[in-house]
């Protein structure tokens, strides 16, 4: 049930009847304050200006045509021409009933699309670090939301699995007689990488061998391909452990590494030349883009093939976008890549559009994000100033949550405590990130994220258990409760019901904008409204069974909404804390 969409259409029709153009925007929004109703239509200002009349005068005319019978109990004009809409308690009650009767809580299924989501993208032969956290969990929240809404989602884990480093690694493994790379731990491999790089920089004979190995690998030599596959296997096996710990939905089947696009690159360069988009410049192949200027104000040159014949990330990204449209049949492509890559992506996509590889009707969206910072406001590092490994961060989260949970539950069995600590610890790390607007940097703070107050995972998980505790005490007959009507008489009942029915609107925003913090804010607000409702509207000691059952149903929908909302974020709920 999308009340905002329903009201928008009703107000738009009334505006047209009052003389507004057919493309008018009613600008129906959820009201910020309770005294302004549940929704506000703010579109009169812009339209009245076009019509040469006062906004309030237009609002009055719109009201004469606005039929919200059975939806709103009151509609009033406020200020210079805002229309405040107060939802009818009977309308709220009816739709709470419908939401409870639906597995999807009344959420409609939009027109199905094929959506490719590019996220996580770690590098082969390196362990995942905290820099991979945001892309991995924000992208996964988007995937979960889009899948819940009914879209066909293709996860694309664009791992860095190609390049000169593989010549180095294979040469060094061979030198160390470590051909059986499949038995190595990734931690070993990182050490190997450092040693290989040192030798590459200091030993010209070794560097030459490494360069030869790259050529052999790229030409398809089976021995070198097999060594390369082993390196990829070790890395992705290790990464899968991290994905599972993080409760993200990525699997090995979702890996679409850079190597996938290699066979396409010569053809793309040739095609761009044939179309007159790419030219030779100082031995390299370059596309000049009018949309991007260099310091001299001239069109910027984007290199797609180096003088030595090598390709660049831009070339791969052009091939990647083409593949996602032509082979995966994407209707929409979302890239969860940090903000530093924005210009690079815009340049690649400008070439993609000019070449006609992806039509304008298929959006390519960079859902960029800021950095994770330490308390000092600088990029998050270890005490020694090194990069924080993601596995180490999750270990610390688990340890801190274990202490927190044990303190509150000294008698809890060890296995139960471990499971709870895992849900709380991992949930805290994820929620702390997801609850921030992804476009901004944020401060990573253990104390804040593990607090039981404020917009945190422990608070949300506790809020859920609090609702469940009502049902444990109530000794409910499920059939009787299902048949009982919902009756809304108190203001707090109405406020809670209205917010519950805004779940679909929230999902729609997250799906459109890729902003999971909007879901976090909604769930936090919902938990707060339930708390006020619980305090002022007795449930178990209600004046009669009819009111008791009705309030139990509001509590039931609250629990279901909190659980489903947290699930779209990849946050586990718990039965008790």
UniProtKB/Swiss-Prot annotation:
GO terms for molecular function: arginine-tRNA ligase activity; ATP binding. Keywords: Aminoacyl-tRNA synthetase, ATP-binding, Cytoplasm, Ligase, Nucleotide-binding, Protein biosynthesis. GO terms for cellular component: cytoplasm. Its EC number is 6.1.1.19. A motif ('HIGH' region) lies at residues 122-132. Pfam families: Arg_tRNA_synt_N, DALR_1, tRNA-synt_1d. It comes from the Bacteria. It catalyses: tRNA(Arg) + L-arginine + ATP = L-arginyl-tRNA(Arg) + AMP + diphosphate. CDD domains: Anticodon_Ia_Arg, ArgRS_core. InterPro entries: aa-tRNA-synth_I_CS, Arg-tRNA-ligase, Arg-tRNA-synth_N, Arg-tRNA-synth_N_sf, ArgRS_core, DALR_anticod-bd, Rossmann-like_a/b/a_fold, tRNAsynth_Ia_anticodon-bd. Belongs to the class-I aminoacyl-tRNA synthetase family. NCBIfam families: argS. Monomer. PANTHER family: ARGININE--TRNA LIGASE, CYTOPLASMIC, ARGINYL-TRNA SYNTHETASE. HAMAP family: Arg_tRNA_synth. This is Arginine--tRNA ligase. The gene is argS.
């Amino acid at each position: 049930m999308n009340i905002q969409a329903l009201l928008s259409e009703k107000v738009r029709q009334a505006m047209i009847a009052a003389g507004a153009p057919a493309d008018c925007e009613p600008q129906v929004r959820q009201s910020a304050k309770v005294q302004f109703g549940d929704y506000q239509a703010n579109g009169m200002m812009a339209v009245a200006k076009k019509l040469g009349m006062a906004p309030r005068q237009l609002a009055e005319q719109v009201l004469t045509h606005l039929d919200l019978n059975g939806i709103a109990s009151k509609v009033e004009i406020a200020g210079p021409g805002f229309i405040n809409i107060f939802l009818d308690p009977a309308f709220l009650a009816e739709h709470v009933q419908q939401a409870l009767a639906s597995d999807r809580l009344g959420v409609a299924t939009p027109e199905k699309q094929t959506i490719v989501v590019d996220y996580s993208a770690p590098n082969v032969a390196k362990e995942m670090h905290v820099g991979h956290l945001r892309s991995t969990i924000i992208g996964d929240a988007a995937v979960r939301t889009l899948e819940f809404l009914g879209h066909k989602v293709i996860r694309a884990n664009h791992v860095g699995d190609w390049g000169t480093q593989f010549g180095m690694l294979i040469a060094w493994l061979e030198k160390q007689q470590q051909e059986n790379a499949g038995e190595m731990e990734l931690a070993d491999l990182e050490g190997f990488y450092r040693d290989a790089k040192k030798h590459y920089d200091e030993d010209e004979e070794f560097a030459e061998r490494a360069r030869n190995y790259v050529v052999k690998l790229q030409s398809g030599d089976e021995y070198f391909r097999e060594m390369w596959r082993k390196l990829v296997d070790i890395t992705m096996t290790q990464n899968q452990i991290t994905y599972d710990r993080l409760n993200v939905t990525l699997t090995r089947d979702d890996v679409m590494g850079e190597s996938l696009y290699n066979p396409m690159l010569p053809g793309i360069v040739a095609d761009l030349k044939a179309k007159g988009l790419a030219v030779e410049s100082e031995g390299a192949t370059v596309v000049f883009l009018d949309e991007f200027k260099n310091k001299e104000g001239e069109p910027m040159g984007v290199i797609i093939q180096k003088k030595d014949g090598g390709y660049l990330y831009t070339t791969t990204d052009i091939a990647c976008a083409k593949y996602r449209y032509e082979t995966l049949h994407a209707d929409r492509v979302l890239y969860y890549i940090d903000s530093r890559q924005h210009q690079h992506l815009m340049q690649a996509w400008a070439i993609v559009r000019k070449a006609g590889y992806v039509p304008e009707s298929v959006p390519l969206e960079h859902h960029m994000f800021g950095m994770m910072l330490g308390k000092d406001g600088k990029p998050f590092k270890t005490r020694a100033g090194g990069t924080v490994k993601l596995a180490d961060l999750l270990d610390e989260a688990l340890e801190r949550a274990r202490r927190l949970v044990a303190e509150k539950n000294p008698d809890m069995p060890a296995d139960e405590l471990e499971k709870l600590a895992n849900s709380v610890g991992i949930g805290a790390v994820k929620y702390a990130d997801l609850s921030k607007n992804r476009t901004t940097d944020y401060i990573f703070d253990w104390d804040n994220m593990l607090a039981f107050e404020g917009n945190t995972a422990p608070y949300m998980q506790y809020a859920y258990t609090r609702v469940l505790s009502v049902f444990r005490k109530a000794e409910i007959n499920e059939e009787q409760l299902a048949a009982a009507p919902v009756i809304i008489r108190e203001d707090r009942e109405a406020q809670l019901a209205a917010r519950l029915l805004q779940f679909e609107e929230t999902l729609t925003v997250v799906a459109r904008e890729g902003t999971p913090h909007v879901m976090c804010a909604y769930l936090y607000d919902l938990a707060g409204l339930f708390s006020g409702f619980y305090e002022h509207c007795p449930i178990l000691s209600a004046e009669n069974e009819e009111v008791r059952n009705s309030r139990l149903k509001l509590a039931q929908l609250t629990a279901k909404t909190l659980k489903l909302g947290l699930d779209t974020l990849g946050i586990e709920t718990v039965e008790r804390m």
